[in-house]
Amino acid sequence: MKGTIIKGIGGFYYIKIDNSEEIIECKARGKFRHTELTPMIGDYVEISVDKNNKGAIEKIYERRSELFRPAVANVTQALVVFSFKNPDINIDLLNKFLLLCEYNNLKAIVCFNKMDLVNKEDYKDIISMIEQAGYDIIFLNAKEERNMDIIKKLIKDNVTVFCGPSGVGKSTMLNKIIGKETMITGNISEKLKRGKHTTRHSELIYVDEGLLVDTPGFSSLDINFMEKEDLLHCIPEFRDFIGECKFTGCLHHREPNCAVKKAVEEGHIHKNRYDFYIKTLEEFMNRRKKKW
């Protein structure tokens, strides 16, 4: 039998069988330990069931994509959920999420939730920065279901991961999409202005001919596994200027006659995005120096 892993808890994996509502609990065969291949949420697998009705994962099919934090396979797009207020937006964190989406070849769609709390005009520079980078934006008020119909259309025929900092309303959005509360949503802590971490595990849910992944909340991202060469290819605004710099292998940092720096000066690339790139690049370079 074949199916998709929709949940994994404590070494047990729950597989939804193709063309069926049946879900079978399985363990992974020991052979996967020798290949260092660990089953992930979203994996398409082949399983066997013995006479005692015990399931085992026999084969993991090739993954189209692979995320490690959160650990999810075969995702096609990411809804990057933030709010301008409650909690206040962290631009560097937003840029890190977008960076990871690019690294993993995921289409990223930025969703600003809790729009009832703010005046959009007060944040037009941030909005302009995201649009200039080529990302679509959806403005939401999930509690009142504002524009949630757009989200539902996007989900069809995709494997979609919800990501973003804690407290911005990811679980509320998920609850509205599937029409019932599958997860307990936490109130914002007045002291920390952060949501309580009430999403306890990653789970894949079938909704309207699409698949959704909701993951445990987190407020920071580690991108230290990336190299500076990766970074160059994860800022989409830079791509139009590839090959136009004086020096081959230009890092768009201190090099003269740099087409990217010129584009920033002329307003073709938003300065905040370039500043984030330089800050991240220097962190990578300093990390490499420490290794030596």
Curated annotation (Swiss-Prot):
InterPro entries: G_CP_dom, NA-bd_OB-fold, P-loop_NTPase, Ribosome_biogen_GTPase_RsgA, RsgA_GTPase_dom, RsgA_N. Residues 64-221 form the CP-type G domain. It is found in: Cytoplasm. GTP binds at residues 113-116, 164-172. Its cofactor is Zn(2+). GO terms for biological process: ribosomal small subunit biogenesis. Zn(2+) binds at residues 245, 250, 252, 258. PROSITE patterns: ENGC_GTPASE, G_CP. Keywords: Cytoplasm, GTP-binding, Hydrolase, Metal-binding, Nucleotide-binding, Ribosome biogenesis, RNA-binding, rRNA-binding, Zinc. Its main location: cytoplasm. One of its GO terms (molecular function) is metal ion binding. Binds 1 zinc ion per subunit. GO terms for cellular component: cytoplasm. Its EC number is 3.6.1.-. One of several proteins that assist in the late maturation steps of the functional core of the 30S ribosomal subunit. Helps release RbfA from mature subunits. May play a role in the assembly of ribosomal proteins into the subunit. Circularly permuted GTPase that catalyzes slow GTP hydrolysis, GTPase activity is stimulated by the 30S ribosomal subunit. Belongs to the TRAFAC class YlqF/YawG GTPase family. RsgA subfamily. Monomer. Associates with 30S ribosomal subunit, binds 16S rRNA. This is Small ribosomal subunit biogenesis GTPase RsgA. It comes from Clostridium botulinum (strain Loch Maree / Type A3).
